[in-house]
Amino acid sequence: MKKSNPLFDELIVIDDPTPRPGPLNMAIDEVLLSRARSAILRFYRWNEPAISFGYFVTFAEASIAAGDRAMVRRWTGGGIVPHGADLTYSIMIGSNSDTFSLPSKSIYENVHRALCSALMATNGDGPLLAVAALYERRNEADSAVIDRRYNDCFASPVHADVMVNGRKIAGAAQRKTRCGLLHQGSIQRGNLSEEFRRIFSQLLANQFITSAIDLDILSTAEELGDTKYAADAWLHRR
């Protein structure tokens, strides 16, 4: 797979096989970010149908969209994202990585450009994904199909989201802190192959190594998930 100017020199890739509850998934991302020395890509799964909603979305708005699904507030921004039939991933970029100095929008676009190329290379959904492209917003009124009810992330494409036949299939949200940048993304295609994950990783970095979540990180994340992400104070903070 040909690649030009990948975002990272080296990337640690974690394909987490265990479906986990939303609060634990969010906590694992935060703990990995706090310990990232370079860049980490994590693919993960959910143990039940759920929605995640951005830091600035109100609980009242998110609960309307959730229905009877589980809910978790993200540390990142963005809108409301359905989980369970998607492939969810996160990228943690440590502050000592050269990539951390890039503008957040540039990181967003480059991640999605690699994702788009990986989708087209593996073509997991047949001819549909062969026409995947990045969204380019020319002005606020150029798309009449945008539906902003309930802050629905996938009804509201922003620049560099991944589109197929006019519909958004991949988006992400970010948070940048002194210790690094967290990029949390969702691809609304749950049947993507291991080959897709491999090619996506290859396109992001000059080299990547596979790893797993160690017990110390998992233990710390379990405590953080219980005390922060599963707590009413966090869920109802807005």
Question: Language-model segments: which ranges?
Answer:
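Short connector loops at helix/strand junctions that flank enzyme active sites
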Residues: 48, 66, 82-86, 157, ...
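Active-site loop/lid in soluble adenylation, ligation, and acyl-transfer enzymes
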Residues: 2-66, 70-74, 80, 90, ...
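Short terminal or interdomain "cap/linker" segment that borders an active site or interface and mediates
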Residues: 15-18, 151-179, 184
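Long, positively charged amphipathic alpha-helical accessory segments at protein N-termini or as interdomain linkers
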Residues: 112-147, 152, 174-238
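Residues forming anionic-ligand binding surfaces in small-molecule and nucleic-acid pockets
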Residues: 79, 83-98
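Short glycine/proline-enriched loop/turn "hinge" motifs that connect secondary-structure elements
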Residues: 3, 79-85, 148, 174-179
